[in-house]
């Protein structure tokens, strides 16, 4: 029977294994060779403020050493092939593939530092992002991710798992930009006075009372037969006292988010630009959906901090290019 004592009678040294950690002092991922009995220390700053990445596949060797050719998968237009799996698209996606499969659902941090104690009910950023993005998509929001790239550097490689990069400061940046660009954060601008004045007043009919339009969607009170209501171009009707105060703050229909013209020229230009064609004047055919861009640095960081893709254009190892992937 084998034992943990060698022929000289001393205890056998525990084998060292390569494990991946996120260093909060250096703000980057590092690979450390440690034994099960040793405390990990960052090889760059020699500090112990680390969190271990849990291996989602124990049978697969993960090597995230940036000096190794096996550390990252080759860059092969990942955003056009992988990001639609996050948000959904007209193209069919493999069953079960979603946000979590791309950003790494099992790559949850496992605290190994004595300076940090995990909590069982800790905030799960990956679940939060998935739910948030799905909510935005359900309202018809279009996303465009703009990636700062170093095309002249042949060493550019995509991480095997985006969660390896977006955990830590990269994840905070992603959440911050999503929150700042959330179309529901500030809402749409007020409708123009001319558009409000042009809304017709119609009489409530018995047929209307028998339909789904038998109540005001703002106050939820049922309409009375023969009463006057305001009608939006999308045909939804509301009490005048309910609709007009809303349109003085937002140009969108409270039910379907159809948008009336505004007096904000910047907003109108953005709406017409995202449409690409059409009059953009609030017709049903020209109805706009929210659209915003998220700018992220190239998700690759060398341990010496170079090649991060976060510098200014024309500096460092080559010119930065901005490339966008529109997720319709």
From Swiss-Prot:
Biased composition (Gly residues): 306-319
Keywords: Acetylation, Metal-binding, Transferase, Ubl conjugation, Ubl conjugation pathway, Zinc, Zinc-finger
Tissue-by-tissue expression: Expressed in leaves, roots, trichomes, stipules, and also in anthers and stigma of flowers.
SUPFAM superfamilies the UniProt entry points to: RING/U-box
Molecular function GO terms recorded: ubiquitin protein ligase activity; zinc ion binding
UniProt entry tagged with the keyword Transferase: yes
InterPro entries (alphabetical): RNF126-like_zinc-ribbon, Znf_RING, Znf_RING/FYVE/PHD
Annotated positions of the N-acetylserine modification: 2
Residue numbers spanned by region Disordered: 264-328
Catalyses which reaction(s): S-ubiquitinyl-[E2 ubiquitin-conjugating enzyme]-L-cysteine + [acceptor protein]-L-lysine = [E2 ubiquitin-conjugating enzyme]-L-cysteine + N(6)-ubiquitinyl-[acceptor protein]-L-lysine
Pathway field: Protein modification; protein ubiquitination
Enzyme class label: transferase
This enzyme's EC code(s): 2.3.2.27
Zinc finger (RING-type): 216-257
A Gene Ontology biological process term: protein ubiquitination
Post-translational modification: Auto-ubiquitinated as part of the enzymatic reaction.
Pfam families for the chain: zf-RING_2, Zn_ribbon_19
Keyword Transport attributed: no
Function summary: E3 ubiquitin-protein ligase which accepts ubiquitin from an E2 ubiquitin-conjugating enzyme in the form of a thioester and then directly transfers the ubiquitin to targeted substrates. Promotes polyubiquitination of target proteins.
Protein name: E3 ubiquitin-protein ligase RING1-like
């Amino acid at each position: 029977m084998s034992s943990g004592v060698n022929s000289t009678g001393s205890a056998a040294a525990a084998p060292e294994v390569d494990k991946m950690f996120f260093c909060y002092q250096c703000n980057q991922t590092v690979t450390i060779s440690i034994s099960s009995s040793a405390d990990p220390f960052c090889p760059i700053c020699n500090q112990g403020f680390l969190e271990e990445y849990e291996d989602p596949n124990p049978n697969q060797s993960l090597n995230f050493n940036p000096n190794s050719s096996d550390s990252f998968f080759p860059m092969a237009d990942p955003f056009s092939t992988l990001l639609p799996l996050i948000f959904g698209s007209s193209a069919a996606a493999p069953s079960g593939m979603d946000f979590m499969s791309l950003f790494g659902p099992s790559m949850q941090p496992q605290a190994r530092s004595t300076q940090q104690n995990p909590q069982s009910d800790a905030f799960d950023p990956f679940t939060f992002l998935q739910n948030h993005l799905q909510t935005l998509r359900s309202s018809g929001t279009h996303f465009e991710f703009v990636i700062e790239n170093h095309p002249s550097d042949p060493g550019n490689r995509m991480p095997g798992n985006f969660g390896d990069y977006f955990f830590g400061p990269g994840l905070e940046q992603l959440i911050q930009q999503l929150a700042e660009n959330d179309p529901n954060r500030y809402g749409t601008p007020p409708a123009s006075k001319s558009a409000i004045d042009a809304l017709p007043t119609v009489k409530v009919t018995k047929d209307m009372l028998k339909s789904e339009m038998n109540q005001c969607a703002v106050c939820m009170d049922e309409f009375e037969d023969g009463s006057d209501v305001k009608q939006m171009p999308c045909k939804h009707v509301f009490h005048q006292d309910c609709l007009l105060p809303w349109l003085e703050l937002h140009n969108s229909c409270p039910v379907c988010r159809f948008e009336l013209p505004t007096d904000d020229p910047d907003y109108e230009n953005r709406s017409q630009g995202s449409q690409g064609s059409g009059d953009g004047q609030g017709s049903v055919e020209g109805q706009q959906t929210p659209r915003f861009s998220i700018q992220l640095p190239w998700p690759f960081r060398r341990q010496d901090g170079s090649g991060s893709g976060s510098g200014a254009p024309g500096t460092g190892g080559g010119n930065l290019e901005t490339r966008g992937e529109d997720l319709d």
